[in-house]
Amino acid sequence: LRVSSHLFIERNGRIVQFVGCGKRAWHAGVSRFNGRDNCNDFSIGIELEGTDFVAFEDEQYQALEKLLKAIDARYGLSYIVGHSDIAPGRKTDPGPHFDWVRLHSARSAFGSPQFAGAAARLQLSILEQSFVRA
């Protein structure tokens, strides 16, 4: 079974790391972004505990912002997208309750990545050109 993500943020903001960010995780599955297939090969997956129909906690957003800042410092962020943007029709997350406006407002703290796709998602795939494996 190939199911995993790099990082998971619990409702209380606790961060759990399942896979090192320099390794391949299996969060995206069959996916495509920016003309490239297999997003697991060049992305870092962050899962937020929740569902498509329940709002996320403030603690989760605070933890997400800290993670993005750390990932940007280490790898540099190029794009931030939801799983539904890279696997449309197959993935719905992060869902309509994800606060993309809040994330946009905080992005100066973690560089200036581009936001792509729809404005509401649960699992974030952080895509970056420098993380590509040959």
Please report, for each region that a protein language model flagged, where it lies by residue.
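Active-site-adjacent loop/helix surface patches within enzyme catalytic domains
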Residues: L1-S78
